[in-house]
């Protein structure tokens, strides 16, 4: 299984668009994860159209248009492995222990603020 992992893209505030190499990885992946802070709903639309499977959540910089379409936490089981995607806006100190307490039922945890 090929996985592409994205987070904190902040399009168009930090860049106008994703680089071609990222789009190549997205299109080659079986599953694409995005851990929030999209900023633009246009990126969600394009990523959704170009991904085989998109698993995503909203981040703290995402407005109402993205929050209405994305969950705060996304869970999926692939090949028997449980994945969770969350942006997680708590303090960096103690994040791993906090996430282990809050989400004990996952095998792979994808967190934003990358």
Segment roles from a protein language model:
Residues 3-34, 38-114:
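Conserved catalytic scaffold of divalent metal-dependent phosphoesterases
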